[in-house]
Amino acid sequence: FSLIENGFKEEEKRALSDYRSNDKEFVKKLAFSAYNSNTYQVRMYGVFLFGYLSEQNDILTFMRDEVSKDDNWRVQEVLAKAFDEFCKNTGYEKVLPIIDEWLENDNPNTRRAVTEGLRIWTSRPYFKDNPNEAIRRIVALKEDPSEYVRKSVGNALRDISKKFPELIKDELNNWKLESKEINQVYKLASKLIN
């Protein structure tokens, strides 16, 4: 893995293969062992495994509280994918309280794992039929102190505007563009709206 410098497909493919061909207890040990590596690519592999195991509460908690502290941005990208894996496997509507909990977390990487992981939100079951539920959750972070999170919020809203331009337009029309934070999100979110 350490020779892979771009992308994550190889780590994802290997993690899925190992998950499918071993019992969960072995995979859990493998995931923690990989995550303890000094090599970010190996940690990425471990986080993919965590995503497959995330119906276990201790794994989901570890993702939220520990993986979110990893200082490598690539590992954070995989955390977003792992969170989406959890939501997909459990059911998006069923995990709304957990989505909300992560969106309110003190760690910006945890909040971003949701906003980025569930992109394109309205392509996901439940949110496809309930786009306002996605919009409501995302816009709650429009003034987030983290620029990293705000960019993800703006991009997520822009994605939604492709399918639901009127909903996003109506939402943006209610914003008071008085801070640089809101203006940053507005600029990203309104990019495709006439």
Role assignments for model-derived ranges:
Residues 1-194:
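Alpha-helical scaffold domains
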